UniProtKB/Swiss-Prot annotation:
Cofactor entry: prenylated FMN; Mn(2+)
Substrates-to-products reaction catalysed: a 4-hydroxy-3-(all-trans-polyprenyl)benzoate + H(+) = a 2-(all-trans-polyprenyl)phenol + CO2
Matching Pfam families: UbiD, UbiD_C, UbiD_N
This protein's UniProt keywords: Cell membrane, Decarboxylase, Flavoprotein, FMN, Lyase, Manganese, Membrane, Metal-binding, Ubiquinone biosynthesis
Disulfide bonds: none
Gene behind the chain: ubiD
Free-text comment on the cofactor: Binds 1 prenylated FMN per subunit.
Oligomeric and partner information: Homohexamer.
Keyword set includes Chloroplast: no
Name this polypeptide is given: 3-octaprenyl-4-hydroxybenzoate carboxy-lyase
Biological processes per GO annotation: ubiquinone biosynthetic process
Species per Swiss-Prot/TrEMBL record: Shewanella baltica (strain OS155 / ATCC BAA-1091)
Protein's membrane topology: Peripheral membrane protein
Pathway assigned in UniProt: Cofactor biosynthesis; ubiquinone biosynthesis
Length: 493
């Protein structure tokens, strides 16, 4: 099932018991965070606060608070089915030439579908049903969440920031948090390596002193939102990818103040510009690490137009110590990454980003080991293959007999198959998450690789241990007599 806009997804969730409407007046200042946090930790539904205190616009939170709802947003019934999305991305990233005539015929539908999914421009879009300019622009009228007691100001969290570099043929969609600075100003917190920041830097170089047009879409359709956090090939727009997943072209419209294209069914659109040198101190904010981050200067986004649907819905979230919504999103997208990594490294059996690791700071990978040093090759490849893993600080490599998603298994492998000196790889002065205050320098830190695989000749001079395994015939016999033993509530091994 596909969803053309956020509202149709809300209806679908409600019909399936995955959304709860809250009519009680709840304050966007701290109260929504506390409620959403409790519900997420209980694996509860998405929440629609219909009467936010001192505001007239409903607030939607916890939309992607379970892997199941992430899968539902992409038209799947189960998070494991998201591997199909990963297989599609793996194909689009590195399409294989046909192995013969039959293979070429089989691949035609996929190529044709990919080529036929450019966005569709529409007139009179829903997102421009209400238009506010000049003195009418007032961001304080939006029910923007103030998430934590130590946060400096309310924070826009789920906005899709739309930019375009002067030398690029396609737009970039990114999700960057934005601090409320005034009635018409937000601080655009994009790090220097992110797509929006790169587009802006390129624009300043090409057109020094000029204003850079930027648009932020709030409450886009769920597939487009998730497309912005998925490793879409650089040659393909997030709109085209969203259309491919939806099976229907993404509807877009021209912004009123510039040539940027925005999702036509979005709930709210913020249009404006970033001045060449206007910066402001951003933060502190409670973040996905579970700590308040440091402050730093980032560009100021001046909003000149606010357009929105009639009876618009404000989409929001909070970030905090895992589990939070980004962590749940990471659990679901984990399944997308597996086929992409396998495409490059077929020896990978499974891949896991534990949510306790703040979504991406630790990865555990199981492999079919084939030669000495193989684990180190895979860990280096994982760090460099996808930009999503640039900030992964720790990678643990285990053999295929170890379940990389089971900490008991992983800890057993680390403690029995590793020598701390021989099997630890340390790399200094690598890109690191700006929010990681444990690094010695902001944005620059080290990485650690742990080779917890069985060691081959050349990696050790000692005879390697043989794992203890029960005789299969004995196991089979005990299975057959288990009920007669009268041992209640014990598992069959």
């Amino acid at each position: 099932m596909s969803f053309k806009d956020l509202r149709s997804f809300i209806d679908h969730l409600e019909a399936n018991g995955e959304l709860k409407r809250i009519s009680y007046p709840v304050d966007p200042h701290l109260e929504m965070t506390e409620i959403a946090d409790r519900v997420l930790r209980a694996k509860g539904p998405a929440l629609l606060f219909e009467n936010p205190k001192d505001h007239h616009m409903p607030v939607l939170v916890n939309l992607f608070g379970t892997p199941k709802r992430v899968a539902m947003a992409l038209g799947k019934d189960d998070p494991l089915a998201l591997r199909e999305v990963g297989e599609l991305l793996a194909f689009l990233k590195e399409p294989e030439p046909p192995r013969g005539f039959k293979d070429a015929i089989a691949k035609i539908p996929m190529f044709k579908q990919a080529l036929n999914m450019p966005p569709k421009t529409v007139r009179n879009p829903p997102c421009q049903q209400v238009i506010k300019t000049g003195d009418e622009v007032d961001l304080t009228q939006l029910p923007i969440q103030h998430c934590w007691p130590g946060d400096v100001a309310p924070l826009v969290t789920w906005g899709l920031t739309i930019t375009k570099g002067p030398r690029k043929s396609r737009q970039n969609l990114g999700i960057y948090r934005q601090q409320l600075l005034g009635k018409n100003k937000l601080i655009m917190r994009w790090l220097s390596h992110r797509g929006g920041a790169l587009d802006f830097a390129d624009f300043k170089q090409q057109f020094p002193g000029e204003r850079y047009p930027v648009v932020v879409a709030l409450g886009a359709d769920p597939v487009t939102i998730l497309g912005a956090v998925t490793p879409v090939p650089d040659s393909m727009s997030e709109y085209a990818f969203a259309g491919l997943l939806r099976g229907e072209r993404t509807e877009v419209c021209k912004a009123l103040s510039c040539d940027l294209e925005v999702p036509a069914t979005s709930e709210i659109i913020l249009e404006g510009y970033i001045g060449p040198e206007e910066l402001a101190e951003e933060g502190p904010y409670g973040d996905h690490t579970g700590y308040y981050n440091e402050t730093d200067k980032f560009p100021v986004f001046t909003v000149t137009h606010i357009t929105h649907r009639k009876d618009a819905i404000y989409h929001s979230t909070y970030t905090g110590r895992p589990p939070d919504e980004p962590a749940m999103l990471g659990v679901a997208l984990n399944e997308v990454f597996v086929p992409i990594l396998r495409k490059q490294y077929p020896e990978i059996v499974d891949f896991y980003l534990p949510p306790e690791g703040c979504s991406y700071r630790m990865a555990v990978i199981s492999i079919r080991k084939q030669y000495p040093g193989h684990a180190k090759r895979v860990m280096m490849g994982a760090w460099s293959f996808l930009r999503q893993f640039m900030y992964t600080k720790f990678i643990v490599i285990v053999d295929e007999d170890v379940n990389c998603r089971d900490w008991q298994d992983v800890i057993w492998a680390i403690t029995t198959r590793m020598d701390p000196k021989r099997d630890t790889v340390m790399i200094e002065n690598t890109p690191i998450d700006y929010l990681d205050f444990a690094s010695p320098v902001a944005g620059l830190g080290s990485k650690m690789g742990l080779d917890a695989t069985n060691k081959w000749e050349g990696e050790t001079n000692r005879e390697w241990g043989t794992p203890i395994v029960m005789d299969p015939k004995v196991k089979q016999k005990i299975d057959s007599i288990w009920d007669e033993l009268g041992i209640d509530d014990s598992p069959t091994l």
